[in-house]
Swiss-Prot record:
It comes from Gorilla gorilla gorilla. The keyword Manganese does not apply. GO terms for cellular component: early endosome membrane; ER to Golgi transport vesicle membrane; external side of plasma membrane; extracellular space; lumenal side of endoplasmic reticulum membrane; MHC class I protein complex; phagocytic vesicle membrane; recycling endosome membrane. GO terms for biological process: antigen processing and presentation of endogenous peptide antigen via MHC class I via ER pathway, TAP-independent; antigen processing and presentation of endogenous peptide antigen via MHC class Ib; immune response; positive regulation of T cell mediated cytotoxicity. It comes from the Eukaryota. This is Class I histocompatibility antigen, Gogo-B*0102 alpha chain. Heterodimer of an alpha chain and a beta chain (beta-2-microglobulin). Residues 25-308 are extracellular. Residues 335-362 are annotated as: Disordered. InterPro entries: Ig-like_dom, Ig-like_dom_sf, Ig-like_fold, Ig/MHC_CS, Ig_C1-set, MHC_class-I_related, MHC_I-like_Ag-recog, MHC_I-like_Ag-recog_sf. Glycans are attached at residue 110. GO terms for molecular function: peptide antigen binding; signaling receptor binding.
Amino acid sequence: MRVTAPRTLLLLLSAALALTETWAGSHSMRYFDTAVSRPGRGEPRFITVGYVDDTQFVRFDSDAASPRMEPRAPWIEQEGPEYWDRETQTSKAQAQTDRENLRIALRYYNQSEAGSHTFQRMFGCDVGPDGRLLRGYSQSAYDGKDYIALNEDLSSWTAADTAAQITQRKWEAAREAEQLRAYLEGTCVEWLRRYLENGRETLQRADTPKTHVTHHPISDHEATLRCWALGFYPAEITLTWQRDGEDQTQDTELVETRPAGDGTFQKWAAVVVPSGEEERYTCHVQHEGLPKPLTLRWEPSSQSTIPIVGIVAGLAVLAVVVIGAVVTAVICRRKSSGGKGGSYSQAASSDSAQGSDVSLTA
């Protein structure tokens, strides 16, 4: 697998763009790579998508009529031809590497070539409000299961099974972690800063959630209170229910944050309560777009209608995202670790944001 120079882009930066401001919160850049074999139907398909925070900004699909890295956000379209040529070549090289990884994995697991198999990788970096590295990561999976991951120290690996231990020993002998760490601490951070600057109006905005509580009778004795948050960005949000001031986490049904289809997100949290005791329950909402946390109660006189159309649209978009980017099977645990971010006066136009100096095969 390649790593430096995913499933998880850098440009010539002028001195005038040196990072001096701070951002409201932490930010991330991730690339998600997926290679899927299809016996009897040609080479494995390879897809890579890049995200800054919750926004997809680039995509490459080897099955396209003319495979190229393509823009998926307005702010990335300003990049010049050299950028797109470089990212396309990096993606094509990674496609070949991951196809080889599929063949290697078949040998490691003693599997037949008759079946379809999947090799995935997610890699990238997080920066804090000051633009400095919080954490770098690189995780691989085979057939939907963890395979090998770079540890938080960016110097060692965790292998999921005996097959992955073969890869671990190979990479340790080649000192691959050192090269990957150089990418994560340098190029990755520099590109992320660049993107945050160019996409400031989109990526660094904070859309306030629209909130309300709905009431759904279950029986004569119980009802469901559902706390809604709609139209917010970024996706990070906290919804909690309390009864007489006591947290009800264990009894709360909480759905995953889902895209609304317009660049914002939706979420709800629900609790089942005894009929007649609704006033004892409060929903608490925390989000970057709120000046202070909100406290909501169900108001019987202002019963809200559930926005079914909006929710269904959100689910439809979510399905497209999941199907179109299978890559999200590899999950990143966000934990902070110290690191230094570089000045982006050093962002070299010859470096790919995805990394291109190292080719890592399992």
